Amino acid sequence: VRATEKFAPIYFFCHPLQSAETDVAERANKRPIWIMGHMVNANYQIDEFVNLGANSIETDVSFDSSANPEYTYHGVPCDCRRWCKKWEYFNNFLKALRKATTPGDSKYHEKLVLVVFDLKTGSLYDNQAYDAGKKLAKNLLQHYWNNGNNGGRAYIVLSIPNLAHYKLITGFKETLKTEGHPELMEKVGYDFSGNDNIDQVANAYKKAGVTGHVWQSDGITNCVASFIRGLDRAKKAVKNRDSSNGYINKVYYWTVDKYATTREAFDIGVDGIMTNYPDVIANVLNESAYKGKFRLATYDDNPWETFKN
C-alpha cells in the first residue's frame, strides 16, 4: 500500500434492527383501540366509515317472525343527527362485508378487523333465541365465511340486548359445530348490551357456557348528554376486566361523538369507542396526551386478549 493511499472507513449500522425492536416494544405497551363505526347498515357505509377512521363497525340485525335474520336495519328512534332508515338485506350485506374483509378483493379494507352485530332480538319470544342463533350461524357461514373457503377475516361480536336470550349463543355455537366448522368460533365473541348489572351478565354467560371472548358494552344514545349517564358502570366493567377473576376481556363505550367524552372514556381505560364520527376518535388518539398510551388496533391484535390498566 502506497503511503499516499488511505483506507476508507467502515461503518456498522444497527439502527434498523434496533428501531424495529423499539417499535415492537412501544407497540406492546400501548393499549390497542377499536374505533367502532355506529349503525353501518347500508353497503356503501362500510367504505364511508372506514375511510373516516373506523377499524371496526357496528351493524344492526333485525329478525322476521320465524327468527331468520332479515335486514340490517335500525329504524326510529336512533341517534341524533343520523338517518335511522338505511338498510340492506342481511345476506347481501354479509356479501359486501366479506369483500371488504377478504385480502385481495378489490373492495378490501385492511384496517377493518372487527364487526359488532347488534342483534335486535326484541321482536322475538325468549324460546326463539336458540333458533335465531342457529339461523344466524348458517347465514354467516354461507355468505360471510364462504363455507370456510377464504371467507371474510374480520372478528365478529354477537351483541345481544336481552340476558334471557343467552341461548342464541348456544344455537350459534352448536350449529357451526354441526356444520363442520367449529374452528370459526375462534373468530366469534360476545356482548350483552342491555346495561344490566355486571353480576347478572356474568350469570348469563355461565348459563351459555361462555368463558372468554367477552366484550362488555356500556353507554347511551348520543341524544342524551353523557354527563347524565356518566361512566360509573363503564368503570365497573373496567374493574372487572382488570381483576384476577373477572369475566370481561374488553370494554367499549357508546355512543361517543364529542372530544371531551372521548378523552374521559380513554382516561378510564376502555378498549373501544362506538361513534358516529370515527374521525373525532382518531383525532383524540393522535393527541399528545394519548398517542403514547394508545394506538389503533390492527388484525394482529387479538380482540379476545385482555389488556389491563
UniProtKB/Swiss-Prot annotation:
Listed InterPro entries: PLC-like_Pdiesterase_TIM-brl
Disulfides per UniProt: C78-C84, C80-C223
Any one Gene Ontology BP term: lipid catabolic process
Superkingdom: Eukaryota
CDD domains: GDPD_like_SMaseD_PLD
Location relative to the cell: Secreted
Binding residues annotated for Mg(2+), in chain numbering: E58, D60, D118
Requisite cofactors: Mg(2+)
Catalytic activity of the protein: an N-(acyl)-sphingosylphosphocholine = an N-(acyl)-sphingosyl-1,3-cyclic phosphate + choline; N-hexanoyl-sphing-4-enine-1-phosphocholine = N-(hexanoyl)-sphing-4-enine-1,3-cyclic phosphate + choline; N-(dodecanoyl)-sphing-4-enine-1-phosphocholine = N-dodecanoyl-sphing-4-enine-1,3-cyclic phosphate + choline; a 1-acyl-sn-glycero-3-phosphocholine = a 1-acyl-sn-glycero-2,3-cyclic phosphate + choline
Phenotype upon changing H74N: Does not release choline from LPC
Family assignment from sequence similarity: Belongs to the arthropod phospholipase D family. Class II subfamily.
Entry function: Dermonecrotic toxins cleave the phosphodiester linkage between the phosphate and headgroup of certain phospholipids (sphingolipid and lysolipid substrates), forming an alcohol (often choline) and a cyclic phosphate. This toxin acts on sphingomyelin (SM) with high activity and on lysophosphatidylcholine (LPC) and ceramide phosphoethanolamine (CPE) with low activity. In vivo, shows potent insecticidal activities. On mammals, induces dermonecrosis, hemolysis, increased vascular permeability, edema, inflammatory response, and platelet aggregation.
Identification of the protein by name: Dermonecrotic toxin LarSicTox-alphaIB2bi
Organism encoding this protein: Loxosceles arizonica (Arizona brown spider)
Lineage: Eukaryota, Metazoa, Ecdysozoa, Arthropoda, Chelicerata
